[in-house]
Amino acid sequence: MSMLFYTLITAFLIGVQAEPYTDSNVPEGDSVPEAHWTKLQHSLDTALRRARSAPAEPIAARVTGQTRNITVDPKLFKKRRLRSPRVLFSTQPPPTSSDTLDLDFQAHGTISFNRTHRSKRSSTHPVFHMGEFSVCDSVSVWVGDKTTATDIKGKEVTVLGEVNINNSVFKQYFFETKCRAPNPVESGCRGIDSKHWNSYCTTTHTFVKALTTDDKQAAWRFIRIDTACVCVLSRKAARRG
């Protein structure tokens, strides 16, 4: 609104400067040429159109409707800042077999936030060659029943399960990776010298953009999801003889 105000003031000053001076060659009785006023009016109309078309709210304002009937503009999925390789909107469940699980699942009726080429990931991600082992066992799955999550501000929000895109109902999926064992095992991480190190496997998290609701307001928010299983180490205190 302030930009519109300054634009109007500038246009007004231009109009004032265009008025004929009493000591100029233009007779006092003559008016300002009609072409000038036409140009000035055009400038004002352009400023008004820009002010009206400018988004008055953040991107959340483009997500409209009730929590059970959210309609999303498909153009939003082309915005790079909203893309995430771990978020998928689809009318059908993504493949779950170990040889077909792909973050770029692009079957009919699917909209992925990620448009770049990525290698396929198995359900026991990562995959190692013979003789190689991971220090922690992990499992990766597409999660389509997430109802709540913690946003980047630490606040619990409701995750939208379904949205309307081009008059079709799309379900929101998240590709999550976590430790296979829900609790740390006594033996610790695989291959770690337990004589000198304490170790345990734990699930780590990251934040991705997702469609959520909070206080009946639908919006894109960063939410926390499981993304890896890592080994945590701490050196054992040396024993004194």
UniProtKB/Swiss-Prot annotation:
Record-level GO BP terms: adult locomotory behavior; axon extension; cell population proliferation; cell proliferation in forebrain; cell surface receptor protein tyrosine kinase signaling pathway; circadian rhythm; extrinsic apoptotic signaling pathway in absence of ligand; extrinsic apoptotic signaling pathway via death domain receptors
Signal peptide: 1-18
Superkingdom per UniProt: Eukaryota
Keyword terms: Cleavage on pair of basic residues, Disulfide bond, Endosome, Glycoprotein, Growth factor, Lipid-binding, Metalloenzyme inhibitor, Metalloprotease inhibitor, Protease inhibitor, Secreted, Signal
Compartment(s) of residence: Secreted; Endosome lumen
UniProt-recorded Gene Ontology molecular function terms: growth factor activity; lipid binding; metalloendopeptidase inhibitor activity; nerve growth factor receptor binding; transmembrane receptor protein tyrosine kinase activator activity
UniProt xrefs under InterPro entries: Cystine-knot_cytokine, Nerve_growth_factor-like, Nerve_growth_factor-rel, Nerve_growth_factor_bsu, Nerve_growth_factor_bsu_mml, Nerve_growth_factor_CS
Disulfide pattern: 136-201, 179-229, 189-231
Annotated binding of a 1-acyl-sn-glycero-3-phospho-L-serine, by residue: 209
Pfam families: NGF
Annotated a 1-acyl-sn-glycero-3-phospho-(1D-myo-inositol) binding sites: 173, 209
Expression sites by tissue: Detected in the granule and pyramidal cell layer in the hippocampus.
Glycosylation (residues): 69, 114, 166
Propeptide: 19-121
Keyword Secreted: yes
Main location: secreted
Function text: Nerve growth factor is important for the development and maintenance of the sympathetic and sensory nervous systems. Extracellular ligand for the NTRK1 and NGFR receptors, activates cellular signaling cascades to regulate neuronal proliferation, differentiation and survival. The immature NGF precursor (proNGF) functions as a ligand for the heterodimeric receptor formed by SORCS2 and NGFR, and activates cellular signaling cascades that lead to inactivation of RAC1 and/or RAC2, reorganization of the actin cytoskeleton and neuronal growth cone collapse.
Family: Belongs to the NGF-beta family.
Name of the protein this chain belongs to: Beta-nerve growth factor
Organism, as annotated: Rattus norvegicus (Rat)
Gene, per the UniProt record: Ngf
